[in-house]
């Protein structure tokens, strides 16, 4: 490697670039192309090393300086401290020039964790939403298993088996079912995780920092957490049916009517508890400070509360439908309504599971729609220029400021160009943290791109140019509790200096936020690093396509020019990409709810065999019976969809004004979309209808004599 123009890279990277051993790479730099000879391959024997080395070329430092045009310059120095860290750190700090920063590895790791903390919490919340819906499904399944054996349990009680033994028996069965189900769930979760990896890494790349995650890493802690969640949720979900099985006397446990009468009494008590849960959820949402976890917990309390309230509301709706429309429905028309009410111990839970999934879907859709509208309006306002140039390149290069300035002057002199603005993306040390900073040289029209979250002072632009002042973006202000008039200490080449905050600007480009400074102000305290972008404002009537083509001829290397419309389109595509993972997990919750409705209807088929046999015996045809069951399932879906609308509104409101503001520091307007509500009702209705097709066919095929046969 001490020989000039030699390099090492991983074998997989070499294969991707079609470079053999001792072959040559051609590096495109700002000035020209530089050849490098690959003299060896780096070992990438495991997933971690493969990801680290995926896009890495290692050379001798002299080769790197020559190729990049940075002779005699370093971008970083890594120091391993032996002992007395604080004393050594202070000594090193005293030696540093104004443009150098001393950062610990621990602080950088903590910064990366903080950047993705809110994103990670929200992903976990979506996963727990699926778990909540699954909890209703587990309750449904275990209740079905208990009800299926009511006669057996009654017989065992008559033979002397105690309540405690019955309770232990049911819990033991649930334990083994939970163990099998959790193991299968973990295996499927690993497969699903591999599929979602690209979606998640794409979102992180778009919002936070660049990662190249291609291999899923599974730790024992993650497997243990999955096992604990699966077993715990099953345990809590099985307690109500287990207690129900032991509560009744041996004689009463033999009668189905005892179950429904007991369920109705329980539903009334649960209705009161659900009110407490909903009120607690709303209180937690708006009285819990800035905690993201409490904000998410409030949504779960609200959803769980409305889920418990669903059977009560279902009974009221069934009474209303029968009372208002009963005279028009006829006998067969009233039967589905009464069947939903009569089997409320089964139908209520299925409707609740479907309602929770659909309300979460409505809430997420309303939130995403509101966010989309807000971002679209922000993009339209924040892209006032007609054309934008991206000027990538190493800011350490001595020639960059001069070449960027020359390019700016050439563009300004082109026919059709009215004015230009410039931007520099850099990082400054603010309050001890490395902070993104955008340095603007504003044209008059550039000022239209700012959306302030406060009444703007007329002197703001003059102060931004001539005084040590900054504008902060809304996320930065939220996360750092910054208000107008406060000062932020920045490390300059002349030492630490307080910059007054004179504005808070709306920004949705990232959730960490950044500082905004005038170029004139910046050059007083820091060295010139050139530009990272130039905005071009065309004269009225100018041919933008022709102007874009002429500017392209002035560009070199990786410099590009794009219209504001192209940037808007790419930004909105990026926005949609960031919510792909949300969409996938949301549909997973809906699928779980669909399985819940299907299992409830299959359970009803078993329990109502004799009842349906009687209907067949008194003259109802197979076709009428199928229609009857389909009407019942459609009614269940319709009820779930109608109840999901107000719950979805509450979920959307908490997501927009509590969870997302605390997570990302953004504020956005609430946009109502009637199409989302209609889609929610249709989703619930169609899901219930599809779930009822197979049970309806099986029930219709049941022979009356077989259905009425008893022991």
Where are these regions (language model features)?
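Alpha-helical transmembrane segments of bacterial inner-membrane membrane proteins
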Residues: 1-711
């Amino acid at each position: 490697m001490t020989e000039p123009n030699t390099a090492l890279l991983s074998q997989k990277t070499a294969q991707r670039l079609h470079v053999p051993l001792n072959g040559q790479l051609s590096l495109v730099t700002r000035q020209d192309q530089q050849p490098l000879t690959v003299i060896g391959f780096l070992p990438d024997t495991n997933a971690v090393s493969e990801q680290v080395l995926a896009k890495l070329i290692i050379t001798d430092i002299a080769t790197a300086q020559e190729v990049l045009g940075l002779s005699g310059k370093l971008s970083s120095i890594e120091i391993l401290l032996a002992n007395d860290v604080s004393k050594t750190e202070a000594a090193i700090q005293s030696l540093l020039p104004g443009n150098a920063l001393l950062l610990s590895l621990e602080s950088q790791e903590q910064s990366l964790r903080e950047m993705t903390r809110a994103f990670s919490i929200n992903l976990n919340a979506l996963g727990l939403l699926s778990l909540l819906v699954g909890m209703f499904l587990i309750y449904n399944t275990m209740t079905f298993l208990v009800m299926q054996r009511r006669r057996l349990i009654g017989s065992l009680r008559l033979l002397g088996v105690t309540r405690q033994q019955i309770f232990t028996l049911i819990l033991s069965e649930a334990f083994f079912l939970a163990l099998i189900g959790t193991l299968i769930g973990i295996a499927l979760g690993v497969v699903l995780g591999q599929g979602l990896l690209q979606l998640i890494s794409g979102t992180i790349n778009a919002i936070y920092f660049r990662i190249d995650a291609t291999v899923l890493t599974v730790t024992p802690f993650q497997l243990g957490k999955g096992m604990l969640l699966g077993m715990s949720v099953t345990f809590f979900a099985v307690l109500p049916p287990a207690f129900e099985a032991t509560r009744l006397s041996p004689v009463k446990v033999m009668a189905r009517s005892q179950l429904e009468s007991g369920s109705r009494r329980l539903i009334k008590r649960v209705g009161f508890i659900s009110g407490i849960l909903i009120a607690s959820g709303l209180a937690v949402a708006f009285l819990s400070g800035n905690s993201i976890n409490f904000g998410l917990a409030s949504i779960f309390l609200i959803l769980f509360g409305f889920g418990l309230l669903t059977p009560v509301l279902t009974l009221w709706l069934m009474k209303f439908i029968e009372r208002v429309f009963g005279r028009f429905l006829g006998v067969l028309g009233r039967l589905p309504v009464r069947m939903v009410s009569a089997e409320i111990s089964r139908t209520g839970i299925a409707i609740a599971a479907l309602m929770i999934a659909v309300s979460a879907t409505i809430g997420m859709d309303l939130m995403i729609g509101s966010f989309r509208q807000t971002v679209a309006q922000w993009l339209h306002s924040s892209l006032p220029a007609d054309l934008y140039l991206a000027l990538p390149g190493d800011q350490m290069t001595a020639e960059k400021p001069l070449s960027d300035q020359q390019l700016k002057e050439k563009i300004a002199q082109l026919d059709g160009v009215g004015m230009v603005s410039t931007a520099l993306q850099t990082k400054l040390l603010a309050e001890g943290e490395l902070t993104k900073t955008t340095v603007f040289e504003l044209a008059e029209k550039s000022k239209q791109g700012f959306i302030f979250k406060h009444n703007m002072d007329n002197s703001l632009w003059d102060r931004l140019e001539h005084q040590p002042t900054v504008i902060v973006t809304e996320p930065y202000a939220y996360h750092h509790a910054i208000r107008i008039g406060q000062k932020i200490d920045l490390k300059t080449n002349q030492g630490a200096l307080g910059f007054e905050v004179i504005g808070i600007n709306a920004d949705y480009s990232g959730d960490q936020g950044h500082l905004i400074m005038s170029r004139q102000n910046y050059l007083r305290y820091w060295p010139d690093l050139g530009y990272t972008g130039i905005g071009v404002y065309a004269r009225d009537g100018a041919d933008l396509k022709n102007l874009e083509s002429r500017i392209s001829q002035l560009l070199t290397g990786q410099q590009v020019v794009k219209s504001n419309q192209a940037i808007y389109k790419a930004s909105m595509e990026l926005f949609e990409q960031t919510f792909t993972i949300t969409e996938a997990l949301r549909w997973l919750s809906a699928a779980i709810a669909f399985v819940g409705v299907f299992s409830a209807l299959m359970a009803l088929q078993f329990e109502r065999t004799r009842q349906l046999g009687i209907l067949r015996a008194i003259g109802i045809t197979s076709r009428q019976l199928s229609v009857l069951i389909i009407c019942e399932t459609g009614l269940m879906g319709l009820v779930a969809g109608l109840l999901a609308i107000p719950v979805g509104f509450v979920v959307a409101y908490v997501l927009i004004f509590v969870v997302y503001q605390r997570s990302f520091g953004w504020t956005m307007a609430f946009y109502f979309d009637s199409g989302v509500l209609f889609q929610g009702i249709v989703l619930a209705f169609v899901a219930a209808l599809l779930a009822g097709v197979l049970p309806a066919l099986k029930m219709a095929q049941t022979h009356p004599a077989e259905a009425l046969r008893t022991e």
